[in-house]
Structure formats: structure tokens, C-alpha cells
């Protein structure tokens, strides 16, 4: 047993230059851990509360000094000298009870999560084991198939593309190191194609390109060209994933989806489902995130009934990494995958519970970054610890994204011959026939 002897928090900056929270945990045997918290641009209505100061004279109101004070003055007093650093569940539960709200609005999910991560890292440090091994034990061996966001749109950019993310997934790679190479080579091939066509190659929040396109289909055509230019086969070697972020397009009053940034076209829900199905039929699209507004549960069940056997349908804003919402979705047959964002729920313990619930229901779980990131690589360890099988951590540029990929390379090297990269088989929520059909496109 090793008690926590000190907890320290401070305000630092994220990848967008906005303030965020960093916490450090120190133990009586010299264990040390640090946790940094990301933040999102496109956030779900039901996410745990990210506590900000609201003082417009400082960081435009986005300061985190209140959350820092909650760690230093409230959480530290409750945990220091009272908890064994290796008792993650007890530490997280104590902070949840200390907050006492449904959405962690009193202390802030950012304050709680920073300490949750730092405690896990301190425990791993004290025991002399990698974080993934500490969190997952001897059964942690699956390296994830990456979702690489190489074209940004929607709330993540200033262009005329409605969909928020266009991603490549190296489903045919033999290892995660090779998957990262496939992605990097395709990223650079895409840049050359854009430059040759006179399009901008500046990057968005997550490191992907954000040039203007005529509509939402043009980026898909560029991805196919880039995959081929890099020497790979679309579908077989590299599949495509998209994040529609449809809550940004939905008008609840008229119950329609409007392509507000591109063509201005409006769709009823059945028409929008058909629109997405048509794209999935014509391109090797293996995953669609948030295809339906986060509050339209019956419509989610409808799209899952129509498309869920042939494409992964991911709930992000829909589930917000919350087991209550996930269980409701499972009961209704809504979605077949959940996006896991640790700061949507606020503790590692609750994150593990969401991943386990998803797996038991046959849903995939995709461990994800946020658009406002830091150099913290916890999600790389988390995805291996849970054998989740898929990770979404941005493009092949910007150090805040690359840090996660580099950590996966290190983990694969540590695991050596026990490491498994599932690739196309990480989509266990799809039938073998559906996986084969995507790879044949």
C-alpha cells in the first residue's frame, strides 16, 4: 500500500492555445504521475461539465483557475493521506461523491479527470510498469486500427464542407507501425494532390487539411486518389470513415438536416439516411460517426436497422461516453459503436465501464482524442489496456496528434510477439461478408 502524499494542479495550454488543466500526483514511495485534460469544439449536450472561469478579461472567459483551485483546495484534501494510489476505483468514486452532481458540474470534469489520470500514472510509475499494462494487466495486447482525420470540415475548419471529418483507416496493414506508415504516406500524397490543384494545404485543429471543396463528396474523391497515389488499394488496404457531426446540421423545429456550409440542400431524416447510404455504397466507407442528431433516438434505431449490418455507426454526441445513454441505445438497437472520450464522462473508471458495456453488447469502442489536445498520451495506453481495437487521434501532423501515434509504436515494440493488430477484424460489429464487401470496393 502506498498513500497519495501530494496533489498539485496548474493551468497550462492546449493545442489551440486555450487554457486547460494539468494535475500531478505524488505517493509516499516516490511514485509520480501527471495528467492533462483535452477539450472539444463540437460537444454533446449531455457531456460532463468542463469548468471554466467565465472571466472575460482573462483568456476570453476560458480560464481554468476555478478548476485548479478545486483540485488544490478540495480534491487534494479529500485524497491526500487517505487513499492507496493503486485503488483507482476508490479514488475515482471518492471524487464523484465529493462533486455530488450528475454532470460533475461542481468540481468540474476537467479537475476530476486530471487527477484520475495522474493517479493511474503515479501507480504505474511506482510499480515500474507501463501505463497500459497497469490499467489492463497481462491481457492487454491488441493494437488499435487508427482513424486518421486527414480532411477537416464542419466545426473543425472554416471551409464549405458540412461533414466534420474525413478519415482513412489502414485496415489491411499488418502492424500498427505499418498502419501509421500507410497513413503518413497517404497524408503526404493527399497534400501533393491538393497543391497540384491549387487548393490550400493549411491544417485544421486536428492536423488535417481544410481546403474548400464544392460539396461533401469531393473530399471522398480526393481520398481515393491519395490512397492510390500512395500505392495502396482503397478498401482493401485503406478504408474510409466519416464524422458527419449531424447535430450541427439538424434543425429540431423542422426536423430536417441542412448542408449549411456547402450546397444548402435540406433533407428529411429518411432522405438523409438515403443520402448517407448512397455515399457508403459508392465509396469504401466503413464507419460513419454521428449520422443522426444526438436527441433523435428513434431515428438512430432506424438508421441502424437500415445500415448497421454493413457499416459501423458510431455514437459520439449521442452517447457521450455515458453508460446510461449507451444502455438505452443498446436496448433500442441504436448505433453499433461508441466513441470513447475520457473527458466526456470524467474518470478512468467510468471510461472502463463504458467500454466493457459496449463490448458485452457487441458494440465496438473507439478511444478518441478531442480537437483541443495536449502532449498527454494516456489514450494510447488506454486503447491497448482495454483491447478496444480502434483509436481516433487525428491526422499525421501536429505534435499533439503524433505523440499518440508514437506512443502506440512504443507499446507495440514493448509487447513484441504478443502484440496483435486486428485491422479489418477490429470491426467485429460487422459481418464477415460486410467487411469483405468494403475491402472489395
Swiss-Prot record:
Is Manganese there in the keyword field? no
Tell me, what is one Gene Ontology molecular-function annotation carried by this entry?
Answer: phosphopyruvate hydratase activity
Q: Where in the cell is it found?
A: Cytoplasm; Secreted; Cell surface
Q: Name one GO biological process term.
A: glycolytic process
Q: Which residues bind (2R)-2-phosphoglycerate?
A: 164, 341, 370-371, 392
Domain of life from the UniProt record: Bacteria
Task: Write down the species.
Answer: Leuconostoc citreum (strain KM20)
Q: Which family does it belong to?
A: Belongs to the enolase family.
> What EC number(s) does this enzyme carry?
4.2.1.11
Binding-site positions, Mg(2+): 243, 289, 316
- Known InterPro entries for this protein? Enolase, Enolase-like_C_sf, Enolase-like_N, Enolase_C, Enolase_CS, Enolase_N
Principal cellular location given in the protein's record: cytoplasm
Query: Pfam families given for it?
Result: Enolase_C, Enolase_N
Q: Tell me the first and last residues of the signal peptide.
A: none
Q: Look up the record and report any one GO term of the cellular component aspect.
A: cell surface
Protein name in UniProt? Enolase
Q: Which reaction does it catalyse?
A: (2R)-2-phosphoglycerate = phosphoenolpyruvate + H2O
Cofactor(s) essential for the protein:
Mg(2+)
In which pathway does this enzyme or protein participate?
A: Carbohydrate degradation; glycolysis; pyruvate from D-glyceraldehyde 3-phosphate: step 4/5
The record's cofactor note says: Binds a second Mg(2+) ion via substrate during catalysis.
Amino acid at each position: 500500500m502506498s498513500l497519495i502524499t501530494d496533489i498539485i494542479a496548474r493551468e497550462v495550454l492546449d493545442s489551440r492555445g486555450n487554457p486547460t488543466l494539468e494535475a500531478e500526483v505524488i505517493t509516499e514511495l516516490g511514485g509520480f504521475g501527471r495528467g492533462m485534460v483535452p477539450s472539444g469544439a463540437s460537444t454533446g449536450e449531455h457531456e460532463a461539465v468542463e469548468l471554466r472561469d467565465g472571466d472575460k478579461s482573462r483568456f476570453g472567459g476560458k480560464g481554468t483557475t476555478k478548476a485548479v483551485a478545486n483540485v488544490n483546495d478540495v480534491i487534494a484534501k479529500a485524497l491526500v493521506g487517505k487513499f492507496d494510489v493503486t485503488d483507482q476505483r476508490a479514488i475515482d468514486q471518492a471524487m464523484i461523491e465529493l462533486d455530488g452532481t450528475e454532470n460533475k458540474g461542481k468540481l468540474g470534469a476537467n479537475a476530476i479527470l486530471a487527477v484520475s489520470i495522474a493517479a493511474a500514472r503515479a501507480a504505474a510509475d511506482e510499480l515500474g510498469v507501463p501505463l497500459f499494462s497497469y490499467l489492463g494487466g497481462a491481457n492487454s495486447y491488441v493494437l488499435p486500427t487508427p482513424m486518421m482525420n486527414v480532411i477537416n470540415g464542419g466545426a473543425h475548419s472554416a471551409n464549405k464542407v458540412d461533414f466534420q471529418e474525413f478519415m482513412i483507416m489502414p485496415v489491411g496493414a499488418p502492424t500498427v507501425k505499418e498502419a501509421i506508415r500507410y497513413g503518413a504516406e497517404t497524408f503526404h500524397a493527399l497534400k501533393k494532390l491538393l497543391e497540384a490543384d491549387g487548393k490550400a494545404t493549411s491544417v485544421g485543429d486536428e492536423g488535417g487539411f481544410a481546403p474548400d471543396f464544392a460539396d461533401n463528396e469531393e473530399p471522398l474523391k480526393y481520398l481515393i486518389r491519395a490512397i492510390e497515389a500512395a500505392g495502396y488499394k482503397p478498401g482493401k488496404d485503406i478504408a474510409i470513415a466519416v464524422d458527419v457531426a449531424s447535430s450541427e446540421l439538424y434543425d429540431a423545429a423542422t426536423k430536417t438536416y441542412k448542408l449549411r456550409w456547402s450546397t444548402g440542400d435540406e433533407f428529411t431524416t429518411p432522405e438523409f439516411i438515403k443520402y448517407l447510404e448512397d455515399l457508403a455504397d459508392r465509396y469504401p466507407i466503413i464507419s460513419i460517426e454521428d449520422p443522426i442528431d444526438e436527441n433523435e433516438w428513434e431515428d438512430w434505431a432506424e438508421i441502424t436497422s437500415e445500415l448497421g449490418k454493413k457499416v459501423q455507426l458510431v455514437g459520439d454526441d449521442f452517447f457521450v461516453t455515458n453508460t446510461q445513454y449507451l444502455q438505452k441505445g443498446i436496448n433500442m438497437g441504436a448505433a453499433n459503436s461508441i466513441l470513447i472520450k475520457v473527458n466526456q464522462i470524467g474518470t478512468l473508471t467510468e471510461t472502463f465501464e463504458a467500454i466493457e458495456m459496449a463490448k458485452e453488447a457487441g458494440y465496438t469502442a473507439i478511444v478518441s482524442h478531442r480537437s483541443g489536445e495536449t502532449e498527454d498520451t494516456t489514450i494510447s495506453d488506454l486503447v491497448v489496456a482495454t483491447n478496444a481495437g480502434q483509436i481516433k487521434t487525428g491526422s499525421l501532423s501536429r505534435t499533439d496528434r503524433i505523440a499518440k501515434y508514437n506512443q502506440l509504436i512504443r507499446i507495440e515494440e514493448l509487447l513484441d510477439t504478443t502484440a496483435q493488430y486486428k485491422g479489418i477484424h477490429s470491426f467485429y460489429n460487422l459481418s464477415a461478408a460486410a467487411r469483405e464487401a468494403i475491402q472489395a470496393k
